[in-house]
């Protein structure tokens, strides 16, 4: 039973390493249409980057509110009765509340949930800015490892496309030279061509979709729950008696460049290499750039701030009435 439980964990890692190394060996030994210097440069650049980004995604992890002692709930009963509250630094900058207007918390993890934090049923744990659960790694993609995950997709897409082009070129040359009259077609080359063609289509499409989401500063989960976010904004508008403004994503910073930088960093070096962003390194001794709170659309922020102030006054009045009674 113990061995069976390790299969979902070890199989994706072994398969990823196996495919990367197998493709590199076949390209080096069987493809002859391109010089060894170029071939070696590409292989020695992309394969290590792919494996490094892959294992960095796993090692770094998505990040969890459980990593912060300040977010742990002491008594769930006190939370439910309104006797225990989230820390001030979190409450002051949180914009997404539950349907009752209270700060979100997780009963299973016994922790206060920051904006964009969600509980994964597969991992049975809350993760910061959770994007999705990916069996390929295996685990969740979240705030801390999202950048490494996207780097893996970018490197793997380029590598698959390179293999597809080179193997196609080699096969075309082989057929045009009528080599089939003298020798059999190499089965490893054909298999690699088929795998690379399929991987190019799948990885490029998935990579493009994730880049699209990053440029909108939106996670996969938020993309699916967009209607819920709009409902929250409508609720805030109702509380303030203001006009209803529909904003597709309140975390959209207004430009693709700013949204991209929020995840991938500000410089070309950060965009191209699987390294931590400069902003996260500078703020490593504070709660900034830790996935606990985020910049949001200014219009949405103003409206949400008004609604939160109103909700605070209403809660105070409600508690005062209860105390009198």
Swiss-Prot record:
InterPro entries in UniProt: Palmitoyltrfase_DHHC, PFA4/ZDH16/20/ERF2-like
EC number assigned by the record: 2.3.1.225
GO MF terms, alphabetically ordered: protein-cysteine S-palmitoyltransferase activity
Subcellular location: Vacuole membrane
Post-translational modification: Autopalmitoylated.
Ranges facing Lumenal side: 30, 169-188
TM region positions: 9-29, 31-51, 148-168, 189-209
GO cellular component, one term: endoplasmic reticulum
Membrane topology value: Multi-pass membrane protein
Catalytic activity: L-cysteinyl-[protein] + hexadecanoyl-CoA = S-hexadecanoyl-L-cysteinyl-[protein] + CoA
Keywords from the UniProt entry: Acyltransferase, Lipoprotein, Membrane, Palmitate, Transferase, Transmembrane, Transmembrane helix, Vacuole
Residue span, DHHC domain: 104-154
Biological process terms in GO annotation: protein targeting to membrane
Enzyme class: transferase
Cytoplasmic topological domain: 1-8, 52-147, 210-325
Functional description taken from the UniProt entry: Palmitoyltransferase specific for VAC8. Palmitoylates VAC8 at one or more of its N-terminal cysteine residues, which is required for its proper membrane localization.
Domain notes for this protein: The DHHC domain is required for palmitoyltransferase activity.
Family: Belongs to the DHHC palmitoyltransferase family. PFA3 subfamily.
Protein's UniProt name: Palmitoyltransferase PFA3
Record organism: Eremothecium gossypii (strain ATCC 10895 / CBS 109.51 / FGSC 9923 / NRRL Y-1056) (Yeast)
Primary gene name: PFA3
């Amino acid at each position: 039973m113990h061995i069976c439980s390790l299969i979902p964990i070890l199989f994706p890692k072994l398969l990823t390493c196996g495919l990367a190394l197998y493709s590199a060996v076949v390209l080096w030994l069987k493809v002859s249409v391109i010089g060894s210097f170029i071939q070696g440069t590409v292989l020695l650049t992309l394969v290590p980057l792919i494996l490094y980004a892959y294992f960095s995604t796993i090692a770094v992890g998505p990040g969890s509110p459980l990593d912060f002692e300040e977010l742990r709930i002491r008594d769930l009963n006190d939370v439910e009765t309104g006797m225990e509250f989230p820390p001030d630094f979190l409450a002051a900058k949180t914009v997404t509340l539950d349907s009752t207007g209270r700060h979100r918390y997780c009963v299973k993890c016994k922790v206060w949930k920051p904006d964009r934090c969600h509980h994964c049923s597969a991992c049975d744990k809350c993760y910061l800015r959770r994007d999705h659960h990916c069996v390929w790694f295996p685990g969740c993609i979240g705030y801390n490892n999202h950048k490494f995950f996207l780097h893996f997709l970018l490197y793997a897409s380029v590598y698959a496309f390179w293999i597809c082009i080179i193997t196609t070129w080699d096969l075309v040359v082989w057929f045009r030279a009528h080599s089939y009259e003298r020798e059999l077609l190499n089965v490893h080359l054909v298999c690699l061509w088929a795998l690379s063609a399929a991987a190019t289509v799948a990885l490029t499409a998935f990579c493009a979709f994730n880049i699209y989401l990053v440029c909108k500063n939106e996670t996969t989960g938020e993309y699916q729950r967009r209607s819920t976010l709009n409902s929250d904004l409508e609720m805030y508008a109702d509380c303030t008696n203001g006009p209803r403004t529909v904003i597709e994503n309140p975390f959209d910073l207004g430009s693709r460049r700013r949204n991209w930088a929020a995840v991938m960093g500000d410089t070309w070096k950060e965009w191209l290499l699987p390294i931590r962003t400069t902003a996260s390194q500078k703020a490593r001794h504070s709660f900034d750039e830790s996935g606990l709170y985020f910049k949001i659309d200014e219009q949405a922020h103003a409206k949400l701030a008004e609604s939160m102030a109103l909700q605070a006054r209403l809660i105070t009045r409600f508690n005062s009435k209860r105390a009198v009674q």
